[in-house]
Regions:
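C-terminal peripheral helix-coil segments that are non-catalytic and often amphipathic
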Residues: 1-8, 137-144, 173-220
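Hydrophobic alpha-helical connector segments
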Residues: 69, 76, 80-112, 123, ...
Length: 220
């Protein structure tokens, strides 16, 4: 009788489970790119993945569990862009400009990711949580320096975050070209209260990132 390698059998089982879970999450991501989260069913996810409902329920208790898994991946992907290496930008307004440009440019480079983030950033509180806090911190610092309009930080946050998310959606739908990215960022900075000259200077300090590159020196 052949000897059974229980350790290897266990490894194979874990690898198979990991692949099945990844298939389900990827299927959900593809559906979520064009559909509201609440409209997707278990049947559609399993059909998209080519798996049975039994396979689904061996990995997730239900759709809420699946949403959470997708959200966790989105948050990780968002932070990967946010934490991309590059030269640091000391100026808080320059950091805002660099971060805005990086996320929009990444949505142009990877439209599926951009579309999913554009949806998930509003639907899942955990997505972009760290980037949200960094943006607010940079807004507070810039306002303390007297460089922004006298608006609340929450209003400033909604302005920046809302425009960036919409621009990411437009970029993922090929309605925004790389040449449009600086104009979007300049519009955000002007809306925050910077003069045209100050906004151009911040864009320059943000470096190549704000001219359409896909990696951020320091995220918003």
């Amino acid at each position: 009788m052949a000897r059974v390698d229980l350790k290897r059998r266990g490894e194979i089982g874990r690898e198979r489970r990991a692949r099945t879970r990844a298939q389900l999450i990827e299927a959900a991501r593809r559906l979520f790119t064009t559909r509201p989260f609440s409209s997707v069913t278990v049947e559609e996810v399993t059909r998209q993945a080519g798996l049975s409902k039994g396979a689904f329920y061996s990995h997730f208790r239900g759709l809420d569990d699946l949403w959470a898994a997708v959200a966790a991946e989105l948050a990780e992907a968002f932070e990967d862009v946010a934490g991309a290496s590059g030269r640091p930008v000391a100026d808080p307004v320059g950091r805002i400009a660099a971060g805005c440009a990086a996320f929009i440019s990444e949505a142009q480079r990877d439209p599926g990711w951009g579309a999913l983030i554009a949806r998930g950033a509003w639907d899942f509180a955990d997505v972009a949580c760290a980037a949200r806090e960094r943006l607010k911190a940079n807004l507070r610092l810039a306002q303390k320096e007297g460089r922004l309009a006298p608006i609340s930080i929450e209003v400033g946050f909604d302005l920046v975050f809302g425009v960036v998310i919409q621009a990411m959606r437009s970029a993922s739908e090929a309605r925004l070209s790389p040449h449009d990215v600086p104009d979007v960022v300049l519009g955000i900075l002007r809306a925050l209260g910077l003069s045209a000259e100050e906004a151009e200077g911040a864009l320059e300090r943000a470096g190549a990132t704000a001219r359409g590159a896909s990696s951020a020196p320091t995220a918003i």
